[in-house]
Amino acid sequence: MDMNMDGKTVIVAGLGVSGQSMMEVLGSRAGRVLGVDEKKPDADLHSFDQIDWDNTDMVMTSPVFNPRTPFILEAQKRNIPVMSEVELAWQLRVNSNTTGKPAQWIGITGTNGKTSTTEMTSEMLTACGLAAPAVGNIGKAVSHAAVDPANDVLCVELSSFQLHFTYSLELDCAAITNIADDHLDWHGGIENYAADKAKVFHNVKKALVYNADDERVTKLAFAAQTAPECRRIGFTLAEPKDGQIGVKDGWIVDMSGIAGGEAGKPFQVAKVTDFTHLTEPDGTVYPHLLADALTALALVLGLGADKDKALAALKQFTPGGHRIQTVAVAKTSDGGTIRFVDDSKATNAHAAKASLNSFADKSVVWIAGGLAKGSRFEQLVADQARTIKAAIIIGKDQQPMLDAFKASAPDIPMSIIDPTDNDTVMARAIDAAGTYAQSGDVVLMAPACASMDQFKSYADRGNQFAQQAQRWVNEHGEA
């Protein structure tokens, strides 16, 4: 793709974090840059109908716009290139001050686990003395990072939205954490969704890291065309096979050779109990966070970083907020507790399943619901019915979750929170949960849905959960 922008007119669609960054990066590189955003007063254009297509050379699009959006279809009909911020960043890479070559890129995608894995990867590489910021879908614009010569490595969280309009990535290391139904309304189906995720594996140079416990990801990994020297490294929560890193007898064990041992022979890397950042107060290690750590470790060692420094950083890493985090604890009269756990970042069924799987049978009062994004939940409820003691249904799009319980677990008690008052929804949900919770139980908010119907973001939803949980604990004293 020709990225010579001299004298060209570029449209930037959507002026959020990535859009604003593209406007700034393109300002000194293109002939004319016009931002389009219906909600931003300072946008150059406030309607896509205002675009002068006859004098437009390129379109940079925000992830919010799906491929069937009219302005995208119009651009494609006119053979005007449409690309993501990630594609722009890749095309505009500058040489690093350290090496005189473009910064290495590590790309991380998947339905769940992207953010934690990206953060872990960044922290380990930073501990190894590299300038390795976490950028991309994680909230920090990749286009600014790509044109900053101070960076040695970019740890890029990549969403399927970003990858759809990305064409030429050839990453140094790449990982797909897992693939499950999500954003199907945007992509038009699971096959399109998986195909966009698979773009990270194309022509990977050093290490292709895949979830060996996920059949779809494994197939994509072995179907991918890579550089001849690239190693395929599977991660698993079971005993690893040749070419994998996994868990055996309380140890992280490498069978791929990336950790210093011989490929095909077990090499003990670290004790699982070393990873206190992955545990709750009772010492429980959450399996999905351990999987994220294995992914990040494989990426970092696959890049060639120092193992000891990387492990030291990983052992001290603390996950970000709203990821299966205990936010309040009520003491009960029998000396036990009721825990309130915020996993607001579990915005799809796959993430909610991982969260529910972390707890004992019939111990979870589950707060679920929100924007379903075209997903169905029958299988999730069927699989996790053994764990769920009661369900509290929030959100404006309640029917998919209600249908799932009716079909898969009709005997589980349920409270439905009236969606008409957004300001009190979480308070009412917590109060309802409190009527079911007893000693030893967990009130878990892992909604399996997006948050924007009733909250500003998943973080806002999590913060409100924490506030209302603490309010309930304060009001009830000993439950």
Curated annotation (Swiss-Prot):
One of its GO terms (biological process) is peptidoglycan biosynthetic process. The keyword Nucleotide-binding applies. Cell wall formation. Catalyzes the addition of glutamate to the nucleotide precursor UDP-N-acetylmuramoyl-L-alanine (UMA). ATP binds at residues 110-116. The keyword Cell division applies. Its EC number is 6.3.2.9. Belongs to the MurCDEF family. It holds the Pfam family Mur_ligase_C. One of its GO terms (cellular component) is cytoplasm. This is UDP-N-acetylmuramoylalanine--D-glutamate ligase. Signal peptide: none annotated. NCBIfam families: murD. PANTHER family: UDP-N-ACETYLMURAMOYLALANINE--D-GLUTAMATE LIGASE. HAMAP family: MurD (MF_00639). SUPFAM superfamilies: MurCD N-terminal domain, MurD-like peptide ligases, catalytic domain, MurD-like peptide ligases, peptide-binding domain. Pathway: Cell wall biogenesis; peptidoglycan biosynthesis. It catalyses: UDP-N-acetyl-alpha-D-muramoyl-L-alanine + D-glutamate + ATP = UDP-N-acetyl-alpha-D-muramoyl-L-alanyl-D-glutamate + ADP + phosphate + H(+). It is an enzyme of class 6 (ligase). One of its GO terms (molecular function) is UDP-N-acetylmuramoylalanine-D-glutamate ligase activity. It is found in: Cytoplasm.
